Regions:
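Bacterial Sec-dependent N-terminal signal peptides
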Residues: 1-29
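Short, hydrophobic/aromatic-enriched beta-strand segments in well-ordered soluble domains
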Residues: 64-70, 118-133, 165-173, 195-201, ...
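Surface-exposed beta-strand/loop patches in extracellular or lumenal glycoproteins
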Residues: 65-86, 157, 163-172
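Hydrophobic helix-coil surface modules that form long, contiguous segments used
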Residues: 158-314
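Short active-site segment of divalent metal-dependent hydrolases/proteases
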Residues: 317-318
């Protein structure tokens, strides 16, 4: 009995020591459940102000800046996610003061020297990761599902930490861009275009999205809603299908509003029909991405293809 009691006590001590996390301990690779819970509990009022400078040549680097504002319940290190080459983090400021950069296991660890209880601002200059930018010769689009926002910019990449995103894109003058929120302003300067978007409603990082490049546009308004379709297709037979595509999007929205009694919760519903998109669609609020082959059908589509398109549009719309 004494022997059993000894082992029970020993096991309890081992578990207690294992649970102790000494201050300054390196974070694990990825987002552990412990880190996710701690951040969700201690951080609130989260906002990202993001700016990307996108060159026309896809071989050139995309330069980024993020200003993260947050409220912290107590002064402790802030662990951000950034799954990229550590050398791509160029500068760190905390509450306006330059701070040393500490990278550990795909995380940027912001120390407590300049953090304070309550409101804080963390500013990072960085080179954007290419993994989730999907860069082509004349366009690019982000796809951050399920946990790839951290491959693009420093963030808290867990879905329960929703944030307001305010985005600026510096792009070639002849390009257009679409994002989760509506355009607030456009400024031209020396062959470049700076597009500022309105703040989004609170979003998870995997739903943040933007598309830029050479795109054609068609718009349709019904029942007080205007939807814009962005596409690169040049076949007139396929482009002419925009009428039925708009019909199905508006029908899906109306059916869902009638069925749930809830108005569409976002400021806009634009759709981007992407050549070779990896999935059938992706429900980014305000900028839904669709696969071109699923949306633009051939001259003699089967019933299955037509129903498949209708089901896809209804499916992505239901997500929102």
């Amino acid at each position: 009995m004494k022997k059993q009691l000894f082992f029970i006590i020993l096991l309890g001590v081992v578990e207690l020591l294992a649970g102790c996390r000494p201050e300054g301990k390196e974070p694990e690779t990825g987002v552990s459940i412990g880190l996710a819970r701690q951040r969700k509990q201690d951080i609130s009022n989260l906002q990202y102000r993001l700016k990307f400078r996108i060159p026309e040549n896809k071989q050139e680097e995309v330069i980024g800046k993020v200003q993260i504002t947050l409220k912290q319940e107590k002064v402790q290190p802030v662990v951000l996610d950034f799954r990229e080459d550590p050398h791509k983090v160029k500068q760190l400021k905390v509450n306006g003061r330059p701070d040393s950069i500490r990278i550990s296991n795909e995380h940027i660890v912001v120390g407590t020297d300049y953090l304070k209880k309550g409101a804080n601002e963390i500013e990072i200059d960085f080179i954007a990761g290419n993994q989730s930018l999907n860069r082509n010769d004349e366009f690019l689009y982000t796809l951050l599902v399920p946990e790839r926002a951290r491959t693009l910019f420093p963030c808290f990449d867990q879905p329960d930490m929703k944030a307001v995103f305010t985005l600026q894109l510096d792009i070639p003058e002849q390009w257009v861009a679409v994002a989760n929120a509506a355009v607030e302003s456009e400024t031209l300067h020396e062959g470049r275009k700076l597009i500022a978007f309105q703040p989004t409603q609170p979003l998870s990082t995997y739903l943040f999205s933007f598309v830029a490049g050479k795109w054609q546009q068609l718009a349709e308004s019904r029942d007080g809603k205007t939807i814009v379709m962005y596409y690169r297709e040049t076949d007139p037979q396929k482009v002419a299908q925009h009428t039925i595509i708009f019909d199905q999007v508006f029908a899906s929205l109306k059916w869902l509003e009638d069925y749930t009694g809830i108005p569409y919760p976002f400021d806009k519903y634009d759709l981007v029909i992407v050549p070779g998109f990896q999935f059938g669609g992706m429900e980014h609020p305000g900028a839904v991405l669709y696969n071109d082959k699923r949306m633009f059908l051939g001259p003699h589509p089967t019933i299955e293809e037509e129903l498949g398109r209708m089901e896809l549009i209804a499916h992505e719309t239901t997500h929102m």
